[in-house]
């Protein structure tokens, strides 16, 4: 199954119980959920590695008898065109100090990430989900403008950790086949404590 494009990326900060932090000050919003979209000029790339563990061949009687497979260790190289400044800093653990500054406070906070793409042939939605991990920003390049702008995208690395809701695995893939898939159920698994928005009665 081939996939094409990036439809969107959603992130949230999570607590020690892998529950979304529903607080605009301590988390990313009142609901805890932050959808990266047109206001951030969208996601450019979300390159996922480590979906399978490394393998070691097992030999016996001068023959290859088996393969021992390690655990998956996913990481996402995530590039956003213009991620909200405060959101970016909160995700990597730089918290506002009330004086216009942002400084690292303790350990890097844990976060969750959901990447949406679609199939080539029939445009069915596919989601790569990470319910627990840490976000880092290893570097920041700054360059002079010439006759052209020199832009530096927001480039972050998400390192996935074990997620309880995924049966102890580090990631889960969802496929919107139009029958079994329920988006609210997916959101509740990926973002622990998520509640679907209520549409006011007319």
Model-derived features: where do they sit?
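N-terminal, charged/glycine-rich beta-strand/loop interface patches
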Residues: 44-66, 70-76
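Short helix-loop boundary/capping segments
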Residues: 104-138, 143
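Oligomerization/assembly interface segments of phage tail-like spikes and tubes
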Residues: 63-87, 150-163
């Amino acid at each position: 199954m081939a996939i094409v494009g990036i439809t969107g990326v959603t992130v949230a900060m999570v607590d020690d119980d892998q529950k979304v932090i529903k607080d605009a000050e301590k988390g990313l919003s009142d609901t805890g959920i932050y959808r990266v979209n047109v206001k951030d000029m969208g996601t450019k790339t979300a390159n996922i590695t480590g979906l399978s563990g490394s393998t070691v061949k097992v030999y016996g009687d001068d023959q290859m008898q088996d393969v021992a497979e390690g655990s998956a260790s996913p990481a996402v190289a995530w590039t956003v065109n213009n991620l909200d400044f405060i959101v970016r800093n909160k995700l990597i653990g730089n918290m506002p100090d009330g004086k216009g500054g942002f400084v690292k406070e303790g350990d890097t906070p844990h976060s969750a990430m959901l990447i949406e793409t679609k199939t080539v042939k029939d445009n069915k939605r596919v989601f790569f989900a990470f319910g627990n991990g840490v976000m880092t920003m290893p570097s920041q390049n700054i360059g002079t403008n010439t006759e052209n702008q020199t832009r530096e995208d927001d480039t972050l690395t998400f390192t996935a950790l074990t997620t309880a809701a995924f049966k102890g695995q580090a990631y889960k893939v969802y496929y919107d086949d139009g029958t079994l898939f329920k988006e609210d159920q997916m959101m509740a698994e990926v973002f622990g404590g998520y509640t679907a928005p209520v549409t006011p009665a007319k």
